């Protein structure tokens, strides 16, 4: 398999952010690192994609945020998963399960 980072498919960024936050609250860089970790380096999320998505997801009520100090004593915005966010993650996980099954079926024919 190619070890180069892959472009995210439409609709996957929200799901990966929500999945990352299941582990606990994180700042933006932590979320980006977590996505890279849980995808085995397949997806690398750049700030230009991450922060607009975080802002939009906060407006949707899927995540909440608060300011705090990072591990190197710099101000950072920390994000956490909300109950509606957990519900959204569950729905997206089911949806992507159906999509991946259908694609696998199509590729086997």
Please give the residue ranges for each predicted region.
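Beta-hairpin "wing" of winged helix-turn-helix
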Residues: 58-75, 80
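Amphipathic alpha-helical dimerization/coiled-coil segments
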Residues: 86-109
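N-terminal helix-turn-helix DNA-binding core of bacterial DNA-binding proteins
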Residues: 6-49
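Accessory beta->alpha helical hairpin/"wing" motif in late/C-terminal subdomains of nucleic-acid enzymes
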Residues: 81-85
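Intrinsically disordered, low-complexity and often Lys/Arg-enriched segments
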Residues: 1-2
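A cross-family signal for key residues in well-ordered alpha-helices
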Residues: 19, 33, 55, 90, ...
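Basic amphipathic alpha-helical segments that dock to polyanions
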Residues: 50-57
